[in-house]
């Protein structure tokens, strides 16, 4: 297997990176790697705890290292945290990869996220915080994206179907 991801998923919280990533990897019979999980495994802490105890800058440094390592060694589907694109070095590293920007409209994202307390940047007014993060990150997602897909009104299966039709040099499905 290649040591370059077949697809790198980016997008805001609630866009489906984790769920779509798992379904896409299963469909293509390749491994899924999630850099948020890599950071949690490395530190033994949750992302939320890292934000509270060490701050966002510390987390972003660990995240950047996790992304770099995964881009160099993972040959499956790679899911990045929503803020991974904030670092210029990460955006530069993504330049040679097939990057899928999974997008979601604010109402759909809020519906998906309201019950998730493990997202430290969305505590409080979920709709307002999401809209604020989305405005700041949208140009960065656009900068790195090979394709853009709005998941707001699509099922996981529909997203996976569309991605399978568009991913270049993907493994043959069985």
What is each of the regions a protein language model found here?
Residues 1-3, 23, 27, 95, ...:
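NTP-dependent small-molecule kinase module
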